[in-house]
Amino acid sequence: MNIIEQKFYDSKAFFNTQQTKDISFRKEQLKKLSKAIKSYESDILEALYTDLGKNKVEAYATEIGITLKSIKIARKELKNWTKTKNVDTPLYLFPTKSYIKKEPYGTVLIIAPFNYPFQLVFEPLIGAIAAGNTAIIKPSELTPNVARVIKRLINETFYANYIEVIEGGIEETQTLIHLPFDYVFFTGSENVGKIVYQAASENLVPVTLEMGGKSPVIVDETANIKVASERICFGKFTNAGQTCVAPDYILVHESVKDDLITALSKTLREFYGQNIQQSPDYGRIVNLKHYHRLTSLLNSAQMNIVFGGHSDEDERYIEPTLLDHVTSDSAIMQEEIFGPILPILTYQSLDEAIAFIHQRPKPLSLYLFSEDENATQRVINELSFGGGAINDTLMHLANPKLPFGGVGASGMGRYHGKYSFDTFTHEKSYIFKSTRLESGVHLPPYKGKFKYIKAFFKN
């Protein structure tokens, strides 16, 4: 038995002590986690800057602050979330009472990506703790400084074998995903998600897969172009475009395309200055592998660049880039970009834009900028996507009352707020029947009982 397997079975043993099922225990662990995150704030911010070049304002808002808010909500609502439900019972089951009891799955695996390497460990972990599970965390090896901080924080905060961190790369992940966990929560690419799903199926382990895809932005002829440009630039170029719900491409009505490109270019200068590489507010690509993938896409689209296009390998810097005259068969349109390159395509009618999106895998997010209520309702009703926004980008993630998750190729399952608790919770149903009364209608022999059975099911 290797070290990873030993940690897995030790975690299972801790769960079997029944300690995590106590509500006061769960609330105390969440309280300890909140305190630890606050204590480690400067270390977390420094690690995020080292690994991804994140400005501390952006890093706090998208990694630390949102996590602390989720802990606060979970602690406040946990008593209500965990209540056993007494549900209605049909008359033909009299004298019976029916219940749904919330119970933890057991020992869960959380695999996190590099783009929000702190938040995307702790958001699902909050749900796992609140639901009463033990957990093993696999942070991304592409953000090693953040991973080391997470491991120190976890080891200093929680009991051994309760919450564990496994560092490493592909080999460690392969070992983990083939173990018989009670639940697997994965955030990452579609290709790796398929591998995780297949491995989990060998042990019939339920999964949540949070993946990505090409999330479109539709800008119609009624849109407020200035507002659209600001909110699109924020959504696309935050974290240097390395956001699973970032706008991947724009579908703009041909009549306002030139105005939009002008506005986007102006907004980028307002956000990051004339020399964007020197801006303290603009991030970096996570590593050279992803840098070279993105510069290859840039090189294939040199004739289409209308803003940006510069890069610096030593700094893993890629300038925010706008591409015009892009077609559906362009190289940039064949894969999720996951970087600061924004293709702009045009359409003539909303029917055409909707058909374009219909022909592609269901996106994780979709955004529409429009003042036309009819257009808004058509997009919401006719297109399938994980989540999205009208006249904004990204910000639907900031509401913990909304479920977050994909559909189709962009993922399965959902979390955030109570939905995180629900994800890591098994709803166990049972009935309690009195021994004092028994109709006997459902028991053999059945002679003469047919009319009574029919009568029961009419009620």
Which residues does each PLM region occupy?
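Conserved C-terminal structural/oligomerization subdomain of aldehyde/semialdehyde dehydrogenase
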Residues: K21-F25, I218, Y317-N459
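Residue-level signal for inorganic ion chemistry
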Residues: R26, I71, G132, I163, ...
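Rossmann-like NAD(P) dinucleotide-binding subdomain of oxidoreductase/dehydrogenase enzymes
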Residues: L91-V227
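Short glycine-enriched loop/turn motifs at secondary-structure junctions
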Residues: H178, M211-G212, T243-V245, Q278-S279, ...
